[in-house]
């Protein structure tokens, strides 16, 4: 029986994780749940899964959650300290790190220091502090399993092979809702347009990141750290059908890929159950019904955020953390109707142009760089919205 702490249980990944837990009560048990603002859903999850600890991001929400959970045997905590307590619960074997954005850094780091294995859905952890987190994973002897569909595909395609034999890591991308939209048309797209992803059901922030292709840029940086691969070996192919989730090409010319229907339950289940597999209820892939699989290079002129992510990784040091922070602020501003879709890239670029990269030696320094990026991006958003 594997005990799980699920950080971000009310988000898309958290909800899917709990569906897998519910389908396999003989294999998984929930020891802790955490959430941001969706207290009603968190309370329903607590009633169903009976965790010992439940944490909310804001301490002021603790009384409200306690009221919603009246009569239940659960310890309710709040704030960063509460998230850390949930992430480091003694009985927990694995932490599902699914808090969106840089807010997941501190509890994920605490879980690693406490010796917990990690199912990593929070890509910002490695984007902003990849060198620090991979050092912690190594020094504390924990296992890190990717939950992103692309990185799970690479992880599976690498099994049993030597890293020296890798020629290329090929991340696939659907191209998002604007794959066939012209640059001129992008100037007028709405929030509703951007949230209408053709293949995947995801949270709002990651869906916008998919529309700008920043999501793929973050995944390139994440892959660099997860698989200890130089950037020049990591490539992106647009694959609109989202059937091949990623590939690895080896020096002998062979390519190994992972295929499946686009459903996040598959990579989540593999991370939870590795090295075994469990049933997910996903519709099986019927290759005979596929009319074709297509691949082509991304348009960096149209999807400028992708190029900015490559630039951030090339600059290194604090720049990826600043880039990620600026993206979070810009996406929020777009979702709130304060800036236009194409201005997301502008906010990120202007923030990066204002930053001089410097070495980051601790999580505290990463958070300082993150805050600088947020403050700078907010100022730019205010200027653009006036």
UniProtKB/Swiss-Prot annotation:
Mn(2+) binds at residues 148, 150, 219. Its EC number is 1.1.1.267. NADPH binds at residues 10-13, 36-38, 122, 124, 203. It is an enzyme of class 1 (oxidoreductase). One of its GO terms (molecular function) is 1-deoxy-D-xylulose-5-phosphate reductoisomerase activity. 1-deoxy-D-xylulose 5-phosphate binds at residues 123, 149-150, 174, 197, 210, 215-216, 219. Its cofactor is Mg(2+); Mn(2+). The keyword Manganese applies. GO terms for biological process: isopentenyl diphosphate biosynthetic process, methylerythritol 4-phosphate pathway involved in terpenoid biosynthetic process. Signal peptide: none annotated. It comes from the Bacteria. Keywords: Isoprene biosynthesis, Manganese, Metal-binding, NADP, Oxidoreductase. InterPro entries: DXP_reductoisomerase (IPR003821), DXP_reductoisomerase_C (IPR013644), DXP_reductoisomerase_N (IPR013512), DXPR_C (IPR026877), DXPR_C_sf (IPR036169), NAD(P)-bd_dom_sf (IPR036291). It catalyses: 2-C-methyl-D-erythritol 4-phosphate + NADP(+) = 1-deoxy-D-xylulose 5-phosphate + NADPH + H(+). Pathway: Isoprenoid biosynthesis; isopentenyl diphosphate biosynthesis via DXP pathway; isopentenyl diphosphate from 1-deoxy-D-xylulose 5-phosphate: step 1/6. Catalyzes the NADPH-dependent rearrangement and reduction of 1-deoxy-D-xylulose-5-phosphate (DXP) to 2-C-methyl-D-erythritol 4-phosphate (MEP). Belongs to the DXR family. This is 1-deoxy-D-xylulose 5-phosphate reductoisomerase.
């Amino acid at each position: 029986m594997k005990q799980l702490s699920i950080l971000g249980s009310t988000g898309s990944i958290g909800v899917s994780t709990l569906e897998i837990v519910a389908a396999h009560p003989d294999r998984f048990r929930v020891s802790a749940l955490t959430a941001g603002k969706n207290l009603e859903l968190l309370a329903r999850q607590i009633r169903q899964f009976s965790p010992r600890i439940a944490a909310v991001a804001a301490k002021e929400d603790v009384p409200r959650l306690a009221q919603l959970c009246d009569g239940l045997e659960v310890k309710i905590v709040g704030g960063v300290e509460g998230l850390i307590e949930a992430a480091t619960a003694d009985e927990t074997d694995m932490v599902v790190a699914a808090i969106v954005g840089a807010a997941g850094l501190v509890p994920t780091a605490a879980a690693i220091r406490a010796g917990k294995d990690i199912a990593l859905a929070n890509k910002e952890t490695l984007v902003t502090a990849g060198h620090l987190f991979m050092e912690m994973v190594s020094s504390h002897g924990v296992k890190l399993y990717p939950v992103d569909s692309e990185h799970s595909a690479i992880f599976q395609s690498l099994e049993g092979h030597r890293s020296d034999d890798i020629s290329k890591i090929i991340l696939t991308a659907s191209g998002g809702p604007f794959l066939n939209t012209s640059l001129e048309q992008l100037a007028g797209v709405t929030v509703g347009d951007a949230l209408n992803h053709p293949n995947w059901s995801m949270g709002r922030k990651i869906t916008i990141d998919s529309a700008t292709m920043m999501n793929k840029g973050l995944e390139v940086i994440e892959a660099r750290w997860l698989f200890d691969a130089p950037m020049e070996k990591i490539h992106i192919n647009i694959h609109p059908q989202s059937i091949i989730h990623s590939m690895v090409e080896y020096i002998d010319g062979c390519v190994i890929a992972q295929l499946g229907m686009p459903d996040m339950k598959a990579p989540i289940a593999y991370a939870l159950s590795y090295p075994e597999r469990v049933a997910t209820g996903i519709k099986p892939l019927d290759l005979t019904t596929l009319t074709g699989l297509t691949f082509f290079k991304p348009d960096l002129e149209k999807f400028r955020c992708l190029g900015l992510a490559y630039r951030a990784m090339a600059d290194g040091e604090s720049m990826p953390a600043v880039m990620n922070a600026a993206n979070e602020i810009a996406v929020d501003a777009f979702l709130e109707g304060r800036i236009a879709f194409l201005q997301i890239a502008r906010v990120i670029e202007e923030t990066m142009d204002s930053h001089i990269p410097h070495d980051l030696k601790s999580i505290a320094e990463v958070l300082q760089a993150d805050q600088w990026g947020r403050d700078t991006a907010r100022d730019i958003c205010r200027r653009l919205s006036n």
